[in-house]
Amino acid sequence: MTEITQKHYLNIKERFGEVMTAVENLGKTVKDAGPVKAKEAELIQLGAALAIRSEGGVHSHVRRALDAGATKEELYHTLILLTSTIGFPAVMAGISWIDDILK
């Protein structure tokens, strides 16, 4: 997340703590419910974040994917695979959002 997104997330978490705890627990539960490994789960969520044009979501899942062992090549390829699905302009925006984090 960018600094602004991180501040916003923390503000929402402070204001709506019970709801955010439930959302975080749901995320953990669904990740633990099947055979998809952490790195692949983050790459899937990275693609989904880009599909809904969520810059903050892309930033977050780039960080999480890196923490789970993804390479920068895997990050970029995950988005490039979406070119025929969500379009070239969206993928180019996503690549710039990955670049924000890798700088």
Give a label for each model feature.
Residues 26-33, 50, 82-85:
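Alpha-helix C-capping/helix-to-loop hinge sites
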Residues 40-43, 75:
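Short runs of predominantly hydrophobic/aromatic residues within well-ordered alpha helices
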Residues 13, 34, 51-55, 69, ...:
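Residues at alpha-helix boundaries and short interhelical turns
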Residues 42-51, 81:
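Contiguous, well-ordered alpha-helical segments that form the cores/surfaces of helical PPI scaffolds
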Residues 74-100:
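C-terminal structural segments of small proteins and small subunits
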Residues 51-79:
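Mid-chain, well-packed structural core segment of small domains
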Residues 1-41, 66-67, 93-103:
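Acidic, glycine/proline-rich low-complexity segments that act as flexible tails and inter-domain linkers
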